[in-house]
Curated annotation (Swiss-Prot):
The keyword Cytoplasm applies. It comes from Pseudomonas fluorescens (strain Pf0-1). ATP binds at K197, E314, G340, G341, D342, T343. Pathway: Carbohydrate degradation; glycolysis; pyruvate from D-glyceraldehyde 3-phosphate: step 2/5. This is Phosphoglycerate kinase. GO terms for molecular function: ADP binding; ATP binding; phosphoglycerate kinase activity. It catalyses: (2R)-3-phosphoglycerate + ATP = (2R)-3-phospho-glyceroyl phosphate + ADP. It is an enzyme of class 2 (transferase). Keywords: ATP-binding, Cytoplasm, Glycolysis, Kinase, Nucleotide-binding, Transferase. Coiled coil: none annotated.
Length: 387
């Protein structure tokens, strides 16, 4: 995968438009989770250090396209950036006709989704974005799977289109895990339904040596192997699909599970051998023996991809399986990559972030990349690099 990288470019005196993913939660005009802003800071600082006139753009929320809405304004993000950078970051609302930014200065453009044609990737709007800059930098991996004006269209028309450090690091990490992974490779894919992760399971079954499944997905594989799952969430119409995947790759199944009679924070947890699961039991986590078995597989792996907690870890009594696997990944010498919202929450809960090789910032984009799909915003950078 060959793209131009912002870090390799001479930006002195250049007008640089950086597309970041600053779509953060805001309450009462204050940013409540700053992870995405923090992730963007090194790119912004590097562009400033290189002497560029920096313009940053992003979307926030889902406003009606072409209409301003105060609740989707990037004003709280501009305020946050001003504090984080120790300098004023003006929010510019009217920028499509041109903006006066001096080298070494920075402005934040108002929500790109206030512009008509953004979602539809209209060429006219994309050309207006491109006219604002000498260099366009795509740094928002989380939106790379969407072909929109500020992620894809502008890259077609800008004089130079490059990947920012955040996007480049993401592509390098995913390429390392999926392109030619060090073997043996283990993948953990968990979630409520096989149907929503079918492409991920099929794609990974072709490259990994051990495909560990969890959650409702594991229940479907258990049922497909003839094991009782009680009243657990599973998909009876996908049993043949589960068998077909298990025929292609080793899918180690739980030997014991943690069950309850109800799905509730106060539910009583009971460990049972898989054969002893009763008709009124719900499987809500893998059992301790299974967790130990899976942990051994992970510790002997050279590449690990993790997407999804293996139990209802939000309730502590059903969190042991996810905790044990998280710690095994942290202790492993393998190259490890993790992605997906629930996965990130589990990583936070068990404090293993520092010991995972790479944590992906993109939910949908991460999954689409794992599925083997082309990400439009990356594809256009590749085609521009070849030109």
């Amino acid at each position: 995968m060959t793209v131009l990288k912002m870090s390799d470019l001479d930006l002195q005196g250049k007008r640089v438009l950086i597309r970041e993913d600053l779509n953060v939660p805001v309450k009462d005009g204050v940013v409540t989770s700053d992870a995405r802003i923090l992730a963007s800071l090194p790119t912004i600082k590097l562009a400033l250090e290189k002497g560029a006139a920096v313009m940053v753009c992003s979307h926030l929320g889902r406003p009606t396209e072409g209409e301003f809405s105060a609740e989707n304004s990037l004003k709280p993000v501009a305020d946050y950036l001003s504090k984080a950078l120790g300098r004023e970051v003006p929010l510019v609302a009217d920028y499509l006709g041109g903006v006066d930014v001096k080298a070494g200065d920075i402005v934040l453009f108002e929500n790109v989704r206030f512009n008509k044609g953004e979602k539809k990737n209209a060429d006219e709007l994309a050309q207006q974005y491109a006219a604002l800059c000498d260099v366009f930098v795509m740094d928002a991996f989380g939106t790379a799977h969407r072909a929109e004006g500020s992620t894809h269209g502008v890259a077609k028309f800008a004089k130079v289109a490059a990947a920012g450090p955040l996007l480049a690091a993401e592509l390098d990490a995913l390429g390392k895990a999926l392109g030619a992974p060090a073997k043996p490779m283990a993948a953990i894919v968990a979630g409520s339904k096989v149907s929503t992760k079918l492409d991920v399971l099929n794609s990974l079954s072709q490259i990994c040596d051990q495909l560990i499944v969890g959650g409702g997905i594991a229940n479907t594989f258990l049922a497909a192997a003839g094991h009782p799952v009680g009243k657990s969430l599973y998909e009876p119409d996908l049993l043949d699909t589960a068998r077909a995947i298990a025929a292609k790759v080793s899918v180690p199944l739980p030997v014991d599970v943690v069950v309850a009679k109800e799905f509730a924070e106060s539910a009583e947890a009971t460990v049972k051998l898989i054969a002893d699961v009763a008709a009124d039991d719900m499987i809500l986590d893998i059992g301790p023996q299974t967790a130990a078995n899976f942990a051994e597989l992970l510790k002997s792996s050279k590449t690990i991809l993790w997407n999804g907690p293996v139990g209802v870890f939000e309730f502590d009594q059903f969190g042991n399986g996810t905790k044990v696997l998280a710690e095994a990944i942290a202790e492993s010498a393998a190259f490890s990559i993790a992605g997906g919202g629930d996965t990130l929450a589990a990583i936070d809960k068990y404090g293993v972030a520092e010991k995972i090789s790479y944590i992906s910032t993109g939910g949908g984009a991460f999954l689409e990349f794992v599925e083997g799909k082309v990400l439009p915003a990356v594809e256009v950078l590749e085609s521009r690099a070849k030109a």
